[in-house]
Amino acid sequence: MAYFRRNFYGGRRHYYRRRNAYTRRRYRRVRRRHRGRRFPYFKQGKRRRTRLLHVTDPRYKAHCTITGWVPIAMTRIQLISQPFTVDTLSPFHVYPGGYGYGVFTLEAMYKEHLMKRNRWSRSNAGFDLGRYLGTWLTLVPHPYFSYLFYYDPEYGNTFEFKKLIHPAIMITHPKTILVLSNKRGGNRRKWPRMWIPRPAIFADGWEFQKDLCQHGLFAFGWAWVDLDRPWMADISKPAQTIDPSTYDKKNDMINKVPNMWWKEAANDWLTEWGRPQGSGVTQQFNQLAMAGPFVLKTNKSEYVNTELLQIILFYKSHFQWGGEFLQDKVLADPTKIPPAQTAYYQQAGQTNLYGSPYKPLSSGLHDSISELPIASPPQNPHKYTVRPSDYDKDGILTEESFRRLTDSPYTSDGGHSFSSFSTASDPLEGTSRYARPLGRKTTREPSRRRKRRRRSPSPEDEETAPIPPKSNSEPSISGPGRATRKQLLQRLFRRLLTSSPQ
């Protein structure tokens, strides 16, 4: 193979390789002393072999993608540097802060599904195992303010994680994403998108969904950042804190506290409600004290045109459901499922196979608005699942597992024992879909048919009629239909004795 580079004469050469300008010098071959292997290939007379790790997957597997959105920030511009606070007295105002953090879990995603905030591509019904693969996050920039977003799959204590959510600390971390505002970064740029792998503590094996809900998938934190004034804001009037009683007579440092010109008792009702409210600056002073490098300042700027700041987050998590149940699969009759196109091309007045008018599809793969039914929350696996922990050391089902598997789903009141609704609110109670419970006395309506008259027995009936027993020790016979073999033999023997000649 020819390769081209500049030669000593300049320009590009047009031959395979450069001609040797001098005869190549030949060296004597020197024998090399070989050292032994650092890691012995043979140990104690046996060759080292690679051990294989076998992982058994469940028989049935299904891929599920959970796509949704979640609001992560809703703050006010006046209280960016303060934490989330709520008034303890009326009117109970809510003051959100300028940073936040949270943890993504499978249980939280199920609760978000109940609020119609996410969509599951595959239902978890019929599966008791689960495996987490990872999550895609898409960050939406704010029109006027920039913020920092930080994620950590291997997080520890959430209280210690909260201490590190500061713009001056997060801005130097490699896992921090700087989301510039549209005012600074432009409106045509792409939204930041990142892939968060599963934590290192998660092995490649499967877990029960109930156990998977107890593990946090990843933790995240966010905080507003000020890149225009990272150190301090524009100060118009400095706060006087040396002698408030002399310099600021009507500009008290604490709201609703009167000027202390003389000593008096501290009456709570008088201090809180009896005096007029002054124009205190304690709140503004605390904001300046709590602010630090890169903290968003609350002074008015050219970018501030709204008081309530909001951020949303889009996520797309990947899971796998698996397992095998000792139950039949629920199938649909393919002859009774109309095509998806018929719901859009039917005219008014036409009916389907059942005689009812066509209606738009409410479920199915062709409907982009419908949702798959999530039968049960992931933290409640199916009760009829046979797990490895249900067997003892000899491979036999334990007593508790056998009782759980053989328990009837119907109770004495007619309702399901594993459902939350009662018998009174059950719309299907009393129909043919429910089995008749044990121990309940059912009353039948009197028959309108005319009762048949009893006729006198014929001679043939008298011969075949049962003979009453002679003593109490003999078994009683209620009829020829219920007679056992022993009773029939006794009846035949007694008839032979009565019919024999004297």
From Swiss-Prot:
Q: Name one GO cellular component term.
A: T=1 icosahedral viral capsid
- Subcellular location(s) per record: Virion
Task: Give the span(s) annotated as Disordered.
Answer: 369-392, 405-487
Record's keyword terms, sorted: Capsid protein, T=1 icosahedral capsid protein, Virion
Q: What is its main location?
A: virion
Composition bias, kind Basic residues: at what positions? 447-456
Biological role: Self-assembles to form an icosahedral capsid with a T=1 symmetry, about 30 nm in diameter, and consisting of 60 capsid proteins. The capsid encapsulates the genomic DNA. Capsid protein is involved in attachment and entry into the host cell.
UniProt similarity note: Belongs to the anelloviridae capsid protein family.
Protein name, UniProt field:
Capsid protein
